[in-house]
Amino acid sequence: MAKRLEIYKCLKCGNVVEVIAGGAGELVCCGEPMKLMDEKNKEGAGEKHVPVVETKDNGVLIKVGSVPHPMDADHWIQFIEVIRKDGKVGRKDLNPGDKPEAFFIMKPEDILSVREFCNKHGLWSK
């Protein structure tokens, strides 16, 4: 059963999906069940992956890692996402060459969680 806001990845083709509305069915791609991505927050290369939240005058700036994450053609952050306490979600999709950061107009106290998805190392959260 897929739940709202879970992230799944196809291990064959690399498709990544986020569940908008949960349901009882199994997510399948390329003829195989998709892998549920666990949220990491400490292990391995955390200094380049765990989101860092900075408060700004009219919102929050989310940077990926205390050390900037590479944004190369073969290794980059695909998106940065903020999940608010009221259930709303903000997301910025990124491409190779972009800065690994996103600005959201919101109050820091409204943040429930922040996460990002690295094409090589998966889903990371704070």
Model-derived regions: residue spans:
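Intrinsically disordered, low-complexity linker/tail regions enriched in polar/charged residues
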Residues: 1-12
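Residues immediately within or flanking Cys/His clusters that coordinate Zn2+
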Residues: 7, 16, 26, 115
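Short cysteine-rich clusters marking metal-coordination/redox-active sites
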Residues: 10-13, 29, 118
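Cys/His-rich microdomains that often coordinate metals
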Residues: 17, 33-34, 122
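Cysteine-rich micro-motifs
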Residues: 23-33
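Exposed aromatic-hydrophobic patches
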Residues: 63-64, 100-107
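Short amphipathic, basic-aromatic surface patches that mediate peripheral association
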Residues: 64-72
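Short acidic/polar inter-strand loop motif in beta-rich domains
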Residues: 119-126
